[in-house]
Structure formats: structure tokens, C-alpha cells
Amino acid sequence: MAAVRGLRVSVKAEAPAGPALGLPSPEVESGLERGEPEPMEVEEGELEIVPVRRSLKELLPDTSRRYENKAGSFITGIDVTSKEAIEKKEQRAKRFHFRAEVNLAQRNVALDRDMMKKAIPKVRLETIYICGVDEMSTQDIFSYFKEYPPAHIEWLDDTSCNVVWLDEMTATRALINMSSLPAQDKMRSRDASEDKSSEKNKKDKQEDSSDDDETEEGEVEDENSSDVELDTLSQVEEESLLRNDLRPANKLAKGNRLFMRFATKDDKKELGAARRSQYYMKYGNPNYGGMKGILSNSWKRRYHSRRIQRDVIKKRALIGDDVGLTSYKHRHSGLVNVPEEPIEEEEEEEEEEEDQDMDADDRVVVEYHEELPGLKQPRERSLSRRSSASSSDSDEMDYDLELKMISTPSPKKSMKMTMYADEVESQLKSIRNPMRADSISTSNIKNRIGNKLPPEKFADVRHLLDEKRQHSCPRPAVSSTKPDIRQRLGKRPYSPEKAFSSNQVVRREPSSDVHSRLGVPRQDVKGLYSDTRERKSGGLWTRLGSTPKTKEKNTKKVDHRASGAEEDDSELQRAWGALIKEKEESRQKKSRLDSLPSLQIEVSRESSSGSEAES
């Protein structure tokens, strides 16, 4: 195997002049003199240090957004501030005997740009930095520099921006002619200007008093060429420019006092400036439908998603129904059958996450290239306070990729090749799902009603009646958990049978008597209703039984009849006749019960308790 050579790259912020110009450093020269091995002679496993001397800020991408001037920019073309251009202008004026009025706003200034670049290493001579533009829009700034139309504007924040021209000469003229010295430097420059004006007046008087020969028309004296006066910058003003001080503007803009200077490479927009913008909170953000106030990141995401869906519909309308989209092969593949026209938009940055925010300045309305001209005009009229501009490539979101992901089917949703086992499994799942639903429903019903206890065996009623007739102990029930009905329903408070066992079963009586159904023996009706007042309601009392007062009367009457029976044999015979009749009736009832089928009664505690709770 070939030997692998490791590399170690070190990035340093500052670089000396030698390596930047491509010259060998003294360390490298000393190493070559000592005879160190060349890179091809490095042994296996050793590391070779390769220094890369570049500034870290140069590696960062440029996220600034440019707002183009639709009215068109102005280019001077030639350096009118150079000494040669000024001399030619003065010679032309003297040749045609023309003396222009002094215009302080349009001065011909000779500025040494090489000296400016040495004094300010990161200066951008084609760009002017302006601050104090709090209530100004992009169009307001373009109209402010209408004498020197700029190419575009780079917004930094609500109060400052960079105005960019296509050449350095126009930017220099705009800075010098549209601004003045600071207030501190004006006092210093006054004395120098007075001395200069006095010297100029003396020279003019000397020229008028001289009796030299007149020159022919179109000729210029060689001696006067050396006496041409150039409107050079004063020493104070030149020092102020070299320090790159803020110069106050000559005129106000919408009541704002502007200050300007040459821009540098450090004048860049900070991340999140659009989110902190008070201008958007007051006047609305055009990139989000003119919404005013604080816009949350979730609201921005929803706005982006709605806009993407709208763009997808527009793209499909451009593509046509007959042109089909190819299959989605890869997530990061390019668009297919979609116009390669970028949709200008800004990126969003999460405050807690490391996503890019709508960082670029949104003071203008973003245009859609698919819009018709008839639709663009009312949009521009309604939102004319911010002019539209094109953004840089680094500031645009990858909308083409998002359109591709939305308009084409996802690989998860696409049909795949399946086997018979997969079909069987899907059928089993479809069968199991309703079974699970049924089991869940039955479990819920059981929880509501309660689990059903195992069925219990009950004794036959006929056997119970036989045992009662023979005065024998009744057979106990199979389950001890089921109590007697009388025990659950309660015993009559005034029942004559005090010592009746709870386990005994009642003898079946006619259904007309309620007390006989509850286990109370039937009493003689004739003896109970001897009173005429009681006989009126005898039909009801035969069913319900006698009251406690009637019971006391009955007992007294029975005692009285017993004592009377000893005296009167007729009464005794009547009593025996009644007993015989009662036995016969009981036998008849027994025969009737024997002919009836077996009857079983099942009453659970839970059902009775549930019925009581419902009542």
C-alpha cells in the first residue's frame, strides 16, 4: 500500500506581507538551507504542517442584500477629480474666455485615493455610509442622491445603510459635494480659507496691471499654464477624510439630519436585525403581507408554507397537465420540468436554534416573477413606500428544492413491490383490529356492570313445601353467598312470627295476600272484620293484613272465644269445622302445586343493590 501522508492545516487571522505576496518566509529559507526533507520525502505516519494565512472574516459568506435603483445609476466614466482633468478644464475655460461662477456644491477636488487606501485599509471608496435614516425608505434615499444616482443600497439597520455606486469617482464627488466638514474642523479651516483668498486677490490684481501682448484666439500662453489654480482640499479637510470622520449633510431629508462617510468592510448587517426592527413593527413588514407588530417564528413558518403552496400551484400551471413529473429519486436532486427561475425570499432564523432569520432588510416588497404586469402595478401602488429590489444569492432560500419535495410524491407514499406474505399480514391486521375493538367494548361493559358470578343451584319449591309440612328442617341452599329474600327485603316491623328462622322458606299462599307472600301466615278474615266500619274496607285489608290495633283486638277476641267454647259446645264445633276446612284447602293447594312445573328464583345482591341505587 502507498504511504499515507497526514496534513495539518492551521488558519491564522493575520498574515505577514511576505507570504501574502508569495515570497518565501525566513523560516522556510532556513529550513531549506539545513536540508530538511521535501514534502515528497516525508516518512509514513508523519504530519506535514501546511499554513493557510487568511482572515476568518473573509471565510464568512456575504449575507448583505442589495436594493437596486430602478431609475438607473450614474457613472462618471473619467476621474474628474484628478489633477490632469482639472488642468484640462481650466485650459478649456481660458481658451474660450469663459469664467464659471463659483459653485460650492460642485467643486472640482483633487483627492489622492492611494493615500486614502493606505490610511484606511478596509475602505470602500465606491460606497458611502449614511446614518440617521430612521423614517426614510429606500426610495427616499434614492431621491436624496438624485444628482448622483447610486446603483443600489445595502440596509444595515433602522438608522444606517450603505449607498453603493459603480465607480469610486462618483462616490467621492457625492461625499465631498453633499456634505461638509464637522463643526470642530470648520473653525480650523476658516483661517486657512481667508489666507488663501487674500493671496488669490493679490495675484488677480497683478494680472490686470500687466501690459503683456494679447494672445491670438485659440492660443494659450505657456507661462499661464503653470499659474493654473486647482481647487485642492484644504489640509484640515484632507485630514478629516483620512480619519474617515462623519460629515454632516448639507440638506435635511424628511426632517432628519444625516451624517455620511466612506464605508468600510466592517459595515455589515448583524444577524437578526430584521427581527429587531422597529420600523417593521410600526409600518409593517412587506415580506409578510404588511403585518405590523411582533411576528413570531411559528407565524413566519406558517406564512412560508402558505406561500410555498401558492407557488406550487403557479408552477403546476406553468408546467401543464400533459407534462408529468418524473419520480422522486433523491431528496436533494434538482427540479424536473420546473422553470429554473429563483423565487426571491429571505431565510428565517430561530432564536434558540441555529436557523437563519429573515435577516436581510425587508423594507421593500418582494416581487414574484410569475405575476402578470397588470397584477404588479396595483401591488406596487399599494406598497409604494418601499421599492422592490433583488436580493443576493446567499440570501435566498432554496425554494426550488422545497417545491420539488412538495410537487413530487414522497418515497414513503409510493407503491412498492409486495409479496403474498405482506398481503396476508395486512389481512390479519384488519381482522385483529375489530377484535381488539370488541374486546375493549366488552371490558368496558364488564367494568360498568360487574363480573357475573357463577350460577347457583336452588332447591325446588315443592320440596321446601313438603319439608315445611312435615315440620322438618329445610335443606340449606347450595351457595351461602345468596341470602334469603326476606333477609334482603327486611322483615315486617309488626310481624306476629317473632321466632321465625331466616333460613326457612315460606309456604306459598294466594297472590291476593301480600303478607302471605312475604312469609306471614294468613289470618281469619271473619274474625278480623267483626266491626262494621272495618268491613267497609275489608277487600284492601284482606290483601294487606291487619294493623297492630286490630291484632290486639283479635287476640282479645280469640281469648274470649276460647273461654266461651268451654261454656258453649256449639262454638267448639264451629272451630273444628273451620280447621277441617283449612286442612282441605291446604291439600287442594298442595295438589295444585304438585301439578305446577319446577320453579327456580335467582336474585343476586349486585342486581338488587344496583336497582336500589338507580331508584
Curated annotation (Swiss-Prot):
One GO cellular component term: nucleus
GO biological process: 7-methylguanosine mRNA capping; defense response to virus; mRNA export from nucleus; mRNA transcription by RNA polymerase II; regulatory ncRNA-mediated post-transcriptional gene silencing; snRNA export from nucleus
Subcellular location: Nucleus; Cytoplasm
Residue positions, PTM Phosphoserine: S25, S73, S209, S210, S410, S563, S615
RNA recognition motif (RRM) domain: annotated segments: 126-187
One matching Pfam family: NCBP3
Main location: nucleus
Gene Ontology MF term list: mRNA binding; RNA 7-methylguanosine cap binding; RNA cap binding
Gene3D superfamilies, A to Z: 3.30.70.330
Subunit relationships: Component of an alternative cap-binding complex (CBC) composed of NCBP1/CBP80 and NCBP3. Interacts with SRRT, KPNA3, THOC5 and EIF4A3.
Name by which UniProt lists this protein: Nuclear cap-binding protein subunit 3
Species for this entry: Mus musculus (Mouse)
Lineage: Eukaryota, Metazoa, Chordata, Craniata, Vertebrata
